[in-house]
């Protein structure tokens, strides 16, 4: 088994080098059936080995889960990943420009693949001839972050993408980084931190800005459904801070939530603005229950968390006819979409992939290759990328922007 996998990996590296040097990606988007999105399907160790044995390397990378994988699979994942981003060894051997990607994969889970894959897709899109290395550090413990950044700096990686949560950023900000090291963090917003470090850039979309935009479409009778997660709690707080003080909050933190006791003959829900700070599944459940109990809300409002085509398959058209969503993704590059599809992720709906691409686009064109052209036009405001917010509505079997924006 081990010998066959090594042979497969060697043949893959040779194939990839040919691809990087000779082939041009088609600007035509692939069909959904050819590059299916398998994000919600579990792939155990046997499944991962099967993907390797059949040569489905991109699928292996996109579905790898470090929590369940054995040591051999972890080693193969790391080697295969660094084989993919080692685009041209002859050029990279003498390259003075380097990019490091630091990932606490046990902490950010599936976001690990999203950040790495979208980075690879962007560099392929730009035909980048730079040295890239991925550092998998497990968790965001201060000692591990210190070790990773020391190693990256010792190896002369001056440009770093770090997939950190709030905890990781707080530990990072304690570090004494070289003055020429620049760090981009796509996963969090600068608003959450008291820092003036000019070499640390933040890339999260602005949920607070989205809430403020959504409330422009409210009639003031605000009712919040929340699922009790850290993100939902932050969204709830944003609504309360921007609202009129009359908001009510209902938290759905279990599958046994009693909708009947809340919705049945509850006149306060009629003609109300219902704000859904809930996951896709719970949003679909709430919207169907609202219709079941003959409630006619003024509007349903939700942020980026529910801007996903999966919502269309989870809900009936009548369930979402009054639903408005905030969206900060604005990708028009079809080749970049295609390359992300190779990794079974959709940059047009995955904000982590989009934010990673936006930040890397800025780093690459401003610092790594100043002769290249930017793909995105998001600007910087005090080292935080600034995203526009568009309001989207469901129309039939798809999404469409409101016309009066």
Located regions from the model:
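Repetitive helical segments and hydrophobic/amphipathic motifs
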Residues: 11-12
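Extracytosolic ligand-binding ectodomains
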Residues: 2-8, 17-405
